[in-house]
Protein backbone atom coordinates (compact mmCIF):
# COMPACT_ATOMS: atom_id res chain seq x y z
CA UNK A 1 0.00 0.00 0.00
CA UNK A 2 2.90 2.35 0.77
CA UNK A 3 4.28 1.79 -2.74
CA UNK A 4 0.92 2.71 -4.29
CA UNK A 5 0.65 5.83 -2.11
CA UNK A 6 4.14 6.90 -3.15
CA UNK A 7 3.27 6.45 -6.83
CA UNK A 8 0.02 8.40 -6.51
CA UNK A 9 1.88 11.14 -4.62
CA UNK A 10 4.48 11.36 -7.38
CA UNK A 11 1.80 11.65 -10.07
CA UNK A 12 -0.01 14.37 -8.07
CA UNK A 13 3.25 16.26 -7.57
CA UNK A 14 3.92 16.22 -11.31
CA UNK A 15 0.33 17.18 -12.02
CA UNK A 16 0.37 20.27 -9.79
CA UNK A 17 4.03 21.28 -10.15
CA UNK A 18 3.13 24.42 -12.07
CA UNK A 19 0.55 27.01 -11.05
CA UNK A 20 -0.74 29.97 -13.02
CA UNK A 21 -3.62 32.39 -12.49
CA UNK A 22 -5.36 31.36 -15.71
CA UNK A 23 -5.84 27.80 -14.49
CA UNK A 24 -9.00 25.92 -15.35
CA UNK A 25 -10.22 22.56 -14.02
CA UNK A 26 -11.94 19.85 -16.06
CA UNK A 27 -13.38 16.37 -15.61
CA UNK A 28 -13.30 13.71 -18.29
CA UNK A 29 -14.35 10.20 -19.24
CA UNK A 30 -12.41 7.94 -21.61
CA UNK A 31 -13.61 4.60 -22.92
CA UNK A 32 -12.98 1.84 -25.43
CA UNK A 33 -13.99 -1.81 -25.75
CA UNK A 34 -11.38 -2.94 -23.17
CA UNK A 35 -11.52 -0.42 -20.33
CA UNK A 36 -12.56 3.02 -19.20
CA UNK A 37 -11.04 5.84 -17.17
CA UNK A 38 -12.15 8.99 -15.42
CA UNK A 39 -9.92 12.02 -15.14
CA UNK A 40 -9.36 15.41 -13.58
CA UNK A 41 -7.50 17.98 -15.65
CA UNK A 42 -5.85 21.30 -14.88
CA UNK A 43 -4.98 23.94 -17.49
CA UNK A 44 -1.82 25.84 -16.60
CA UNK A 45 -2.17 28.07 -19.65
CA UNK A 46 -3.90 28.02 -23.03
CA UNK A 47 -1.21 25.67 -24.35
CA UNK A 48 -0.14 23.53 -21.36
CA UNK A 49 -2.37 21.27 -19.26
CA UNK A 50 -2.13 18.13 -17.16
CA UNK A 51 -4.50 15.33 -16.34
CA UNK A 52 -4.72 12.59 -13.73
CA UNK A 53 -6.81 9.57 -14.78
CA UNK A 54 -7.98 6.54 -12.81
CA UNK A 55 -8.88 3.28 -14.54
CA UNK A 56 -12.31 1.92 -13.63
CA UNK A 57 -13.44 -1.71 -13.23
CA UNK A 58 -10.55 -2.56 -10.90
CA UNK A 59 -10.60 -3.50 -7.21
CA UNK A 60 -9.81 -0.58 -4.88
CA UNK A 61 -6.56 -2.19 -3.69
CA UNK A 62 -5.35 -2.35 -7.29
CA UNK A 63 -6.20 1.13 -8.61
CA UNK A 64 -4.25 2.07 -11.71
CA UNK A 65 -3.52 5.76 -12.28
CA UNK A 66 -2.01 7.63 -15.17
CA UNK A 67 -0.82 11.20 -15.31
CA UNK A 68 0.08 13.22 -18.36
CA UNK A 69 1.40 16.64 -19.28
CA UNK A 70 -0.12 17.81 -22.57
CA UNK A 71 0.51 20.57 -25.07
CA UNK A 72 -2.22 22.08 -27.30
CA UNK A 73 -0.49 22.60 -30.63
CA UNK A 74 -3.70 23.82 -32.32
CA UNK A 75 -6.37 25.63 -30.32
CA UNK A 76 -9.50 27.10 -31.90
CA UNK A 77 -12.93 27.97 -30.50
CA UNK A 78 -14.45 24.70 -31.70
CA UNK A 79 -11.55 22.26 -31.37
CA UNK A 80 -8.12 21.58 -29.89
CA UNK A 81 -5.43 19.13 -30.88
CA UNK A 82 -2.86 18.02 -28.36
CA UNK A 83 0.14 15.81 -27.78
CA UNK A 84 1.63 14.81 -24.45
CA UNK A 85 3.81 12.58 -22.33
CA UNK A 86 2.60 10.55 -19.40
CA UNK A 87 3.11 7.62 -17.10
CA UNK A 88 0.82 4.87 -15.91
CA UNK A 89 1.36 3.07 -12.61
CA UNK A 90 0.23 -0.10 -10.82
CA UNK A 91 -1.71 -2.71 -12.87
CA UNK A 92 0.24 -1.49 -15.90
CA UNK A 93 3.58 0.30 -15.49
CA UNK A 94 4.91 2.34 -18.35
CA UNK A 95 5.05 5.59 -20.24
CA UNK A 96 2.70 6.78 -22.95
CA UNK A 97 2.34 9.40 -25.66
CA UNK A 98 -1.23 10.69 -26.07
CA UNK A 99 -2.33 12.37 -29.29
CA UNK A 100 -5.86 13.71 -29.28
CA UNK A 101 -8.55 16.02 -30.56
CA UNK A 102 -11.23 17.73 -28.46
CA UNK A 103 -14.27 19.08 -30.29
CA UNK A 104 -16.83 21.53 -28.84
CA UNK A 105 -19.70 21.30 -31.34
CA UNK A 106 -22.28 23.31 -29.39
CA UNK A 107 -21.83 27.08 -29.47
CA UNK A 108 -23.83 27.64 -26.28
CA UNK A 109 -21.93 24.85 -24.44
CA UNK A 110 -18.26 25.65 -25.12
CA UNK A 111 -17.23 24.04 -21.81
CA UNK A 112 -18.46 20.65 -23.02
CA UNK A 113 -16.44 18.69 -25.56
CA UNK A 114 -16.11 15.27 -27.15
CA UNK A 115 -12.64 13.85 -27.53
CA UNK A 116 -10.78 11.06 -29.23
CA UNK A 117 -7.29 10.06 -28.18
CA UNK A 118 -4.68 7.70 -29.55
CA UNK A 119 -2.12 6.42 -27.03
CA UNK A 120 1.17 4.72 -27.72
CA UNK A 121 2.13 3.02 -24.46
CA UNK A 122 5.39 1.27 -23.61
CA UNK A 123 4.54 -1.28 -20.89
CA UNK A 124 7.62 -2.04 -18.80
CA UNK A 125 6.12 -5.16 -17.17
CA UNK A 126 5.64 -6.91 -20.53
CA UNK A 127 8.47 -5.18 -22.39
CA UNK A 128 5.99 -4.42 -25.14
CA UNK A 129 4.41 -1.46 -26.94
CA UNK A 130 0.65 -1.05 -27.41
CA UNK A 131 -1.53 1.29 -29.42
CA UNK A 132 -4.82 2.21 -27.71
CA UNK A 133 -7.68 4.37 -28.92
CA UNK A 134 -10.22 6.09 -26.65
CA UNK A 135 -13.29 8.26 -27.09
CA UNK A 136 -14.91 10.34 -24.41
CA UNK A 137 -16.40 13.46 -22.93
CA UNK A 138 -14.89 16.46 -21.14
CA UNK A 139 -16.37 19.33 -19.15
CA UNK A 140 -14.34 22.43 -18.23
CA UNK A 141 -15.29 24.52 -15.20
Predicted regions and their residues:
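Cleavable N-terminal export/targeting peptides
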Residues: 1-24
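Residues on the lipid-exposed face of transmembrane beta-strands in outer-membrane beta-barrel proteins
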Residues: 38-42, 67-71, 85-87, 97-103, ...
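Short glycine/proline- and aromatic-enriched beta-strand/turn motifs that initiate or cap beta-hairpins
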Residues: 21-67
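Transmembrane beta-strands of outer-membrane beta-barrel proteins
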Residues: 25-29, 48-52, 79-85, 97, ...
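Short loop/turn motifs that connect adjacent beta-strands in outer-membrane beta-barrel proteins
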Residues: 21-23, 47, 74-81, 106-112, ...
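Transmembrane beta-barrel domains of bacterial outer-membrane proteins
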Residues: 50-56, 62-69, 79-89, 113, ...
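Sequence/structural signature of outer-membrane beta-barrel proteins
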Residues: 34-36, 55-59, 72-76, 88-92, ...
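Residues that define the transmembrane beta-barrel architecture of outer-membrane proteins
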Residues: 32-38, 61-65, 79, 91-97, ...
Amino acid sequence: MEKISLRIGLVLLLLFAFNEAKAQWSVSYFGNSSNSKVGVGYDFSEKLWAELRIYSDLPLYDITVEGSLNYNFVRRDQYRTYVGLGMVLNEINGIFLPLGVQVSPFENLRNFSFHIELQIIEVFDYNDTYLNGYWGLRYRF
